[in-house]
């Protein structure tokens, strides 16, 4: 076991997560069609503060993230402060770590708490795949800059004459890695082939995810942590996530064609997480500040770890890399965990990470560790379903996982929970949570 790194303030306070809330998650171009990311963020933070009844002046910092950037609101965190009636003096800044963005937001607030610069803060993230920053071609952008500097109409017309019809076409946001040109689904296909993940295994995991998420909603387990969203024209509120397939069968999954490798692939739209809109936020405090306010925390942040690997081959192995480090810093082993929640970007990616967490060879030859991190107990794993079912608003997923895991730990009488995710750029994130 390596060095244990306790997450405590200088006064010995633990980092408490006192509450968490999210919007329902909606598939792209459905319930949140036309609602920009900043409005989703304001929606969830405003409701979180109203429900908590914590005075606005208690919150000293807000760290918030988005992955699909809004050019008109680059510092989304500050816009949320100004748009929710929070104290205008509240410090606010934005972060982005791809699919691990709200993990990063939580870590940043925790670090401010440990440093003693604040005693309470909000962390979260939001994304909209329905309101996208549509760009222009490089040639049109180049010409527009020159046109802005041109002094005469003839100069402007001469510049515009260089353009062709194709240069005027809108350019949607890239869905591929900037450095490699590979789409996330291409990487998932790589991983399926590298680790021998079959189509049947992927479909079975996706089916399991939807079944468990549907059951969680049916049992009322998510009501406390998901707000009702009222959206224009205010005729039909959104109460639940709208991606979950409650009545699907494995036979339904088998009907879909591969989405990326059309000839030989196994990754489909059904065994991948869909493009999604939504927002999530959590309130963190020092343990003593929570006691002063008479608040009972959902739980505590025990440790966290971020890792990075190469992006050319099998880059979505973040959980296999970050989990052993987070467990080491928490002073725990895999067998001591009560719950394990892993982000399901793709079923292939999820199954590959599960395989490597239990691999002695991977531990020795790749991680340089003496033993495997540990086998993933299916009875502890994604017990309420995962991102394939709920959806994945990129910056919101981490905080969803944290809130969901802490509530489930409390229902089980406490214990330790691991939340972990892969992210674009070969990044990985893991956090160990504790509930009493």
Swiss-Prot record:
Active-site feature positions: 99 (acyl-thioester intermediate), 392 (proton acceptor), 422 (proton acceptor)
Molecular function via GO: acetyl-CoA C-acyltransferase activity
Keyword Signal in annotation: no
Main location per the UniProt record: cytoplasm
Alphabetical UniProt keywords: Acyltransferase, Cytoplasm, Fatty acid metabolism, Lipid degradation, Lipid metabolism, Transferase
Intracellular or extracellular location(s): Cytoplasm
UniProt-listed GO biological process terms: fatty acid beta-oxidation
Keyword Isomerase: no
Quaternary data: Heterotetramer of two alpha chains (FadJ) and two beta chains (FadI).
Record family assignment: Belongs to the thiolase-like superfamily. Thiolase family.
PANTHER family linked: ACETYL-COA ACETYLTRANSFERASE, CYTOSOLIC, ACETYL-COA C-ACYLTRANSFERASE
Name of protein: 3-ketoacyl-CoA thiolase
Lineage start: Bacteria, Pseudomonadati, Pseudomonadota, Gammaproteobacteria, Enterobacterales
UniProt gene name: fadI
